[in-house]
Amino acid sequence: MQSVIYSNKSQECERAIMLLLNVHEDFHEYILDEDFTDKQFHAEFGDTAEYPQISIGLKHRGGLKETLQFMKDNNMF
């Protein structure tokens, strides 16, 4: 399954990348100011969205906390 991370290169984003690597998940990282702007990020995910935002498969899962819960619920660990 392909995953996507919208990242600002913060420590939280690096944790999300390590998580996906550890569960052998293929992913693509989109980086703030290289692949998208902050305005585009908030237009897509909302004004209160924080980095990282993660999609697994074709579905947006949310931030790191929501992604961890999804992975736990789906026995991905």
Which sequence ranges carry the predicted segments?
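Non-catalytic, surface beta->alpha helical segment in thiol-disulfide oxidoreductase systems
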Residues: 56-77
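Local sequence-structure signature of Cys/Sec-based thiol-disulfide redox active-site neighborhoods
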Residues: 1-28
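Conserved residues at beta->alpha junctions
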Residues: 7-8, 32, 58
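Thioredoxin-like thiol-disulfide oxidoreductase module
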Residues: 31-48
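Structural micro-motif
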Residues: 45-55, 64-65
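Short phosphate-engaging motifs
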Residues: 12, 37, 63
